[in-house]
């Protein structure tokens, strides 16, 4: 396994393991990283990070942050994160519906921004939880 991946949130180490591949949700789209990748620093968006260890994919929801890639070391600093394995799909779907309603009811720019952020987080949580049932990475 070629990559050492560390995901660190303000309150804990979310992930610290070796893997063969990682797909990151960057601010400009998904970014795949394999062993030998060129050094880079990138902003991360709210979305699902996927990690491949042998033939198994693991999904982790990231709530924005930064990633640094150098010498097969990936350091990911995030505002928050949640592993797909701890997400309750029914609860996540309910939150998706509620956040969509909040967005529709929002009046001020601040309310719209906050509702949009909640909606994006809810969508990412549902997407990650769904990967547990069908193992599709997209």
Swiss-Prot record:
Produces ATP from ADP in the presence of a proton gradient across the membrane. Gene3D superfamilies: F0F1 ATP synthase delta/epsilon subunit, N-terminal (2.60.15.10), Helix hairpin bin (1.10.287.540). It comes from Galdieria sulphuraria. Pfam families: ATP-synt_DE_N. Disulfide bonds: none annotated. F-type ATPases have 2 components, CF(1) - the catalytic core - and CF(0) - the membrane proton channel. CF(1) has five subunits: alpha(3), beta(3), gamma(1), delta(1), epsilon(1). CF(0) has three main subunits: a, b and c. Its main location: plastid. GO terms for cellular component: chloroplast thylakoid membrane; proton-transporting ATP synthase complex. It is found in: Plastid, Chloroplast thylakoid membrane. Belongs to the ATPase epsilon chain family. It is a peripheral membrane protein. The keyword Membrane applies. Keywords: ATP synthesis, CF(1), Chloroplast, Hydrogen ion transport, Ion transport, Membrane, Plastid, Thylakoid, Transport. InterPro entries: ATP_synth_F1_dsu/esu (IPR001469), ATP_synth_F1_dsu/esu_N (IPR020546), ATPsynth_dsu/esu_N (IPR036771). This is ATP synthase epsilon chain, chloroplastic. GO terms for molecular function: ATP binding; proton-transporting ATP synthase activity, rotational mechanism.
């Amino acid at each position: 396994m070629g990559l050492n991946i560390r995901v660190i949130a303000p309150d804990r180490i979310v992930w610290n393991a070796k893997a063969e591949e990682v797909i990151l949700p960057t601010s400009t789209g998904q970014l795949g990283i394999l062993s030998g990748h060129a050094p880079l620093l990138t902003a991360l968006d709210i979305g699902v990070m996927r990690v491949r260890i042998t033939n198994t994919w693991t999904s982790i929801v990231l709530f924005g942050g930064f990633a640094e890639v150098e010498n097969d070391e990936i350091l990911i600093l995030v505002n928050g994160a949640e592993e797909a394995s701890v997400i309750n799909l029914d609860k996540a779907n309910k939150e998706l519906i509620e956040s969509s309603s909040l967005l529709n009811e929002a009046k001020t720019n601040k309310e719209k921004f906050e509702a949009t952020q909640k909606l994006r987080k809810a969508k990412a949580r549902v997407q990650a939880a769904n990967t547990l049932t069908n193992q599709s990475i997209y």
